Curated annotation (Swiss-Prot):
InterPro entries registered for this protein in UniProt: BLOC-1_pallidin, Snapin/Pallidin/Snn1
Subunit structure: Homodimer. Octamer composed of one copy each BLOC1S1, BLOC1S2, BLOC1S3, BLOC1S4, BLOC1S5, BLOC1S6, DTNBP1/BLOC1S7 and SNAPIN/BLOC1S8. The BLOC-1 complex associates with the AP-3 protein complex and membrane protein cargos. Interacts with BLOC1S4, BLOC1S5, DTNBP1/BLOC1S7, F-actin, SNAP25 isoform 1 and isoform 2, SNAP47 and STX12. Component of the biogenesis of lysosome-related organelles complex 1 (BLOC-1) composed of BLOC1S1, BLOC1S2, BLOC1S3, BLOC1S4, BLOC1S5, BLOC1S6, DTNBP1/BLOC1S7 and SNAPIN/BLOC1S8.
Subcellular localization(s) per the UniProt record: Cytoplasm; Membrane
Membrane topology note: Peripheral membrane protein
Keyword Cytoplasm in record: yes
Pfam families in UniProt: Snapin_Pallidin
Stated name of the protein: Biogenesis of lysosome-related organelles complex 1 subunit 6
Any Gene Ontology biological process: bradykinin biosynthetic process
Keyword Membrane: yes
Length: 172
């Protein structure tokens, strides 16, 4: 019985030879090419670079993040200060111009008078709507009452017609 044997790897002799024994690599056939180890070296270098970058990031990143937060806070504070300064400057400009202040007072009086008239009109409209609602309610109640009376009148007429219809007399 003959069992098939898998082929030997490249460069390995399986049969007898005068100078080599079985299983030893053949000289010249298993020599590595000069580019063969570069891929493995690149993979090792990539891992080393990743570890170095990770170490640098873990060392400097917290400080950089704190600095970033501090700068953001300072920037926000600076914006708030600038806004406050602009408001104060505008207040001083308003205070220095008396004509503008007088114009503001007259404008305020004008708008106050408008508000008073609008309020009076709103009160009048409220009173009118209240009266209209009461009147509408009375009319609705009156219509319901009339409808009820008509319905009762129809029922009475129906009963009267019912009584007026001929009924057979009872035999005794």
């Amino acid at each position: 019985m003959n069992v098939p044997v898998p082929p030997p790897p490249d460069g390995v002799l399986t049969g007898p030879s005068d100078s080599l024994e079985a299983g030893e690599p053949t000289p010249g056939l298993s020599d590595r090419s000069p580019d063969e180890g570069l891929i493995e070296d690149l993979a090792l270098e990539d891992r080393a670079v990743e570890h170095l970058v990770g170490g640098l990031l873990s060392h400097y990143l917290p400080d950089l993040q704190r600095s970033k937060r501090a700068l953001q806070e300072l920037t926000q504070n600076q914006v708030v200060l600038l806004d406050t300064l602009e408001q104060e400057i505008s207040k001083f400009k308003e205070c220095h111009s008396m004509l503008d202040i007088n114009a503001l007072f007259t404008e305020a009086k004008h708008y106050h008078a408008k508000l008073v008239t609008i309020r009076k009109e709103m009160l009048l409209l409220h009173e009118k709507t209240s009266k209209l609602k009461k009147r509408a309610l009375k009319l609705q109640q009156q219509r319901q009452k009339e409808e009820l009376e008509r319905e009762q009148q129809r029922e009475r007429e129906f009963e009267r017609e019912k009584q007026l219809t001929a009924k057979p007399a009872k035999r005794t």
